Design a protein with these regions (language model features):
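Rossmann-like dinucleotide-binding domain for NAD(H)/NADP(H)
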Residues: 88, 92-93, 189, 226-346, ...
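Phosphate-binding beta-alpha-beta segment of Rossmann-like dinucleotide-binding domains, i.e.
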Residues: 88, 96-144, 152, 156-164, ...
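Conserved N-terminal Rossmann-fold NAD(P)-binding element of oxidoreductases
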Residues: 8, 147-148
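N-terminal glycine-/charge-rich "phosphate-binding" loop or analogous flexible N-terminal tail
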Residues: 1-45
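Phosphate/diphosphate ligand-binding glycine-rich loop within oxidoreductases
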Residues: 28, 34, 46-122, 137, ...
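Rossmann-like adenosine-cofactor binding region
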Residues: 54-61, 173-270
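NAD(P)-dependent dehydrogenase/reductase Rossmann-like domain
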Residues: 286, 290-535
Length: 535
């Protein structure tokens, strides 16, 4: 399959070259497009890669019927309609690590510049003055730096701040305590406790409903007298009016701002007239190295998502809890086990599954959410009118259909790579289990009460029959005469002479006519056909 990618917003050529080098990918590189032009063109592309200048709005996504991936060369994704992308099954991929050092270095450069009055000193020197006595500054050493958001950038700021002899405290309710210990930062239990102790407050969080306006009038009032506020994250985290009032009243010593509520900043914005504010035009990531890094990172991720389906870098897909290559067999197994269960229930007359429960071994604990999404996808494939049903939107689609999704802890299982998918509705239930070790094709090990050992590949026949001589031979003969090649045939029984189950892996498709012929064989009581989609 070949793919078309639209690249815009002047992405670094080193990243674009990685896409161009792939024979299955064709690239159209264009300047930033007006929205109307983007709407007219987007339908023909499988992916778009850009920066913040291009807004990927809900109407753009709805027009993009082929779109699989949106790549953002940078960190912030507030220019992308994430909820719409998720509902449509479009992966959103950013490059959070590529510009880390650029932002960190700008932070220290700007803060030191303000504390040492470097902009004023430079201006006065160029004006022919020698204002040495009026430029008495202050040092970083001994000050308390409060960090809100201890992710990549916050952690790197903390490491370098300690080298300056600063006392570093931080607040981030989503980061494990071990991370605070690793970067040798004092963990604060509330935003208020950080505010009350910070001589310099710096923000390194995404812009979300939770963080919008997070630093307002009340929060600024909690800061010590003559504190410094730094926002190099996203505009809107700091209430600009409240900041301006605190600067005018001299409650704050100053501020360093690189991100604004509305960009570009209006020429007459009152912040521009404040002498104790250092303003930069959102240049946190504006280094040659950072632009190259984020372009390379996002283009690699977009390429891998298109060519191999790897979604580990997607911000709107469930966390896989490890390396994608290690977890991929488990995702495949969960999806295909659900498909097998659905097919068996259909032969029993049940068309509506009400509940999906996934149980997994200890090695897959971190991937539970992704496994559940994959099982939901396997259940729904072929039964819903959804052009892009995948890990990204399968849970939402299932929940919208009233299907209850859950995971169950199974800490005592002997096999750490085991997975069981249990489907139920009304009085009926089926459990399909298997094992999925890294680097090894997954195998089904149990279907209902029957223990089997078969690889779920291409097409799987599940037959129930009486445990009597001749059934296997008749099934094999019928399939052979129909031109269907058997890859594996596993027969299981609960007791001699009772009911048996056959799991037959075959190459290619099995038509409805062949299935009906199987049902007409003596002693065969049911026949289900599961065709596994690639991926």
């Amino acid at each position: 399959m070949n793919y078309k990618v639209l690249v815009t917003d002047e992405i670094d050529p080193e990243g674009v070259a990685l896409l161009v080098a792939e024979p299955r990918i064709s690239v159209d590189e264009v300047p930033t497009l007006p929205k109307e032009d983007l709407l007219n063109r987007i339908a023909e592309y499988d992916a778009i890669v850009g920066r913040s200048a291009t807004r990927i709005s809900a109407d753009v996504l709805e027009k993009a019927r082929k779109l699989k991936v949106v790549g953002r060369a940078g960190v912030g994704v507030d220019n992308i309609a994430i909820d719409t992308a998720t509902s449509l099954g479009v992966a959103v991929i950013n490059a959070p690590a590529g510009n880390t050092i650029a932002v960190v270095e700008l932070f220290f450069g700007a803060v030191i510049s303000l504390l040492r009055h470097i902009p004023r000193a430079d201006t006065s020197m160029h004006a022919g003055r020698w204002d040495r006595s009026a430029l008495l500054g202050s040092e970083l050493k001994g000050r308390t730096l409060g960090i809100v958001g201890l992710g990549r950038i916050g952690s790197e700021v903390a490491t370098r701040a300690r080298a300056f002899g600063m006392n570093v405290i931080a607040y981030d309710p989503y980061i494990a305590p071990s991370r605070f210990e690793a970067v040798r930062v004092q963990k604060m239990e509330s935003l208020e406790s950080v505010l009350e102790q910070s001589n310099i407050l710096t923000l390194h969080t995404p812009l979300t409903d939770e963080t919008t306006g997070m630093i307002g009038k009340r929060e600024i009032a909690r800061l010590p007298q003559h504190a410094l506020v730094v926002n190099m994250a996203r505009g809107g985290i700091v209430d600009e009016k409240a900041l301006l009032d605190a600067l005018k009243s001299k409650h704050l010593f100053g501020a360093v701002i690189d991100a604004y509520e509305k960009e570009p900043l209006a020429p007459d914005h009152p912040l521009r007239s404040m002498p104790n504010v250092l303003l930069t035009p959102h240049i946190g990531a504006s280094t040659m190295e950072a632009q190259r890094n984020v372009a390379v990172d996002v283009c690699i991720a977009v390429r891998d998502a298109l060519l191999s389906g790897e979604l580990s870098r997607s911000i709107n897909v469930a966390d896989v809890g490890g390396q994608w290559s290690d977890i991929e067999p488990a995702l495949t197994l969960a999806r295909r086990a659900a498909g097998v269960g659905r097919a068996i229930l259909a032969t029993q007359g049940m068309r509506v599954v009400q509940r999906v429960d996934v149980r997994s071994g200890s090695a897959l604990t971190g991937a539970k959410s992704a496994l559940l999404a994959s099982a939901a996808r396997g259940l729904l494939e072929g039964t819903v009118e959804q052009e892009r049903l995948n890990l990204i939107n399968a849970r939402t689609v299932a929940e919208n259909r009233g299907i209850d999704l859950s995971t169950t802890e199974t800490p005592t299982q002997d096999n750490p790579f085991s997975i069981e998918v249990r489907l139920s509705g009304g009085m009926q239930e089926i459990a399909v289990a298997g094992t999925a070790q890294p680097g090894v094709p997954p195998r089904l090990t149990r279907i209902g009460a029957f223990h089997v050992d078969v690889q779920p590949r291409d097409t799987l026949l599940i037959l129930t029959n009486n445990d009597v001589p001749g059934v296997i031979g008749r099934v094999g003969t019928l399939l052979g005469e129909a031109g269907v090649n058997i890859a594996e045939y596993h027969q299981a029984r609960l007791a001699q002479g009772g009911q048996a189950l056959a799991a037959v892996s075959v190459d290619g498709d099995v038509s409805e006519a062949i299935r009906e012929s199987l049902l007409r064989l003596p002693d065969v009581s049911s026949a289900a056909v599961v065709c596994f989609n690639p991926g």
